[in-house]
Amino acid sequence: MNNIHDHKILILDFGSQYTQLIARRIREIGVYCELWAWDVSEEQIKEFAPNGIILAGGPESVTAKDSPRAPEYVFTAGVPVLGICYGMQTMSEQLGGKVIQGVGEGEFGYAQVELQTQSELFKSIEDAISDSGKPLLDVWMSHGDKVSEIPEGFVTVANTETCPYAAMANEEKKFYGVQFHPEVTHTRQGKRMLEHFALDICQCDANWKPASIIEDAIERLKQQIGDDEVILGLSGGVDSSVVAMLLHRAIGDKLTCVFVDNGLLRLNEAQQVMDMFGDHFGLNIVHVDAENRFLDAMAGEADPEAKRKIIGHVFVDIFDEESKKCVNAKWLAQGTIYPDVIESAGSATGKAHVIKSHHNVGGLPDDMEMGLVEPLRELFKDEVRKIGLELGLPYDMLYRHPFPGPGLGVRVLGEVKKEYCDLLRLADAIFIEELHKADLYNKVSQAFTVFLPVRSVGVMGDGRKYDWVVSLRAVETIDFMTAHWAHLPYDFLGRVSNRIINEIDGISRVVYDISGKPPATIEWE
């Protein structure tokens, strides 16, 4: 088997919102890469031994005195370097070129660049031909500053009407700079440019594939764990489910999964988890029915942050109790994924800001004397899903809309009661079922129902009823950082509303949330 980490790209992060996207694109090409902060040491780079380095974008201005710079070793390491946006500007400035501050003439959004010179990076790539017979590329720009003079040894590869150096290259040293963003889908041939860089220029083999990743993970788990036993908190979500399947393949019945039913799950979800992992896949699962314990702990509490913390604390207490019963367990498995690792590194340097407290299993007791097993910590979410498919998990489960860790605890507004959860479960199930029937489920990024703790008058037959209100929420988004409300057809919404009001005793009104993010968040709490 080829070592999936033999060939690799190092991406240095200067703070761009697109940096993780670069890493995901390189991984999609089949090449392993890691994302590090820009201020790494020469020793760290040497130890990582990348086949190529990408300098990502960032919000700073190269013209500012204290703006970040690439380590000098990047340009003497003898490996290809690709600078993207800010990365191109700092490369240019550090190698003797010049960058000028943009004054009212930056480029933001769609642009067309004209190729002036042949380059390995743009080999056989074009979107159109200019009047003068030169290749044109549709790209996505997002810059104020621009390179005004390229370093010695570089040639101009592409330009736009307002940007004389939209791409530059030193083919001898294999240094390349692009002012646009090849990692975003708006740059139509962007992935091919990154393929040229990773596969042709850096000479990486495309070994980073789901089957190889699984093989490598299982081998490493066997070496790490040996004959010991492992305990895993299985939620039925994507990450913990894939961890469970990997560990089951690696160590079989030496894995104990603890599934805590907190009473805040979707309709029939607890039974589905037990059926799939227990009956179908044959995993060793401890099912803890803790609905009353969670609801009792939250009684009278209406504050969303407080509810999240209570749910987290009760889970930790239960998991701690169950782990003590597994007297031979030496290892605790977690579904940590690569963005969690990046985020915690960011918060360690003070660059990350928490908007809502995270509800991962990261809050487990410090005094659990176990080693930590994190088989997904190198993987992005889309990679985890692909691995799940390869391991035999159903598509519908892996590509289901996101569900918050606290579950219905943050979809019942205010105080959480069993009655509210039961009504919400039924309403949400109808909404999701109708989305599937209308072939709309995969056309929206996330859809769910929210329980509002207010009563509204309704008319049923000859009588009036005074019952609860639910809100439907559906959004379209690429990255969940911003989102538009989904323009679902009126007749569809009418059908969902009719079914909820007619089939669920206790709900008298259905509303549809048409708030975007920002200013609203996707979840109500």
From Swiss-Prot:
Keyword Ligase (UniProt): yes
Domain Glutamine amidotransferase type-1: 8-207
Organism per entry: Shewanella woodyi (strain ATCC 51908 / MS32)
Biological role stated in the UniProt entry: Catalyzes the synthesis of GMP from XMP.
Entry-linked Pfam families: GATase, GMP_synt_C, NAD_synthase
Gene, per the UniProt record: guaA
Annotated metabolic or biological route of this protein: Purine metabolism; GMP biosynthesis; GMP from XMP (L-Gln route): step 1/1
Gene3D superfamilies (alphabetical): 3.30.300.10, 3.40.50.880, HUPs (3.40.50.620)
Ligand binding (ATP): 235-241
Key words, A-Z: ATP-binding, Glutamine amidotransferase, GMP biosynthesis, Ligase, Nucleotide-binding, Purine biosynthesis
UniProt-listed Enzyme Commission number(s): 6.3.5.2
Taxon lineage: Bacteria, Pseudomonadati, Pseudomonadota, Gammaproteobacteria, Alteromonadales
Catalytic center residues: 85 (nucleophile), 181, 183
UniProt domain GMPS ATP-PPase: residue ranges: 208-400
Protein name: GMP synthase [glutamine-hydrolyzing]
HAMAP family membership: GMP_synthase (MF_00344)
ATP-binding among keywords: yes
Subunit and interaction comment: Homodimer.
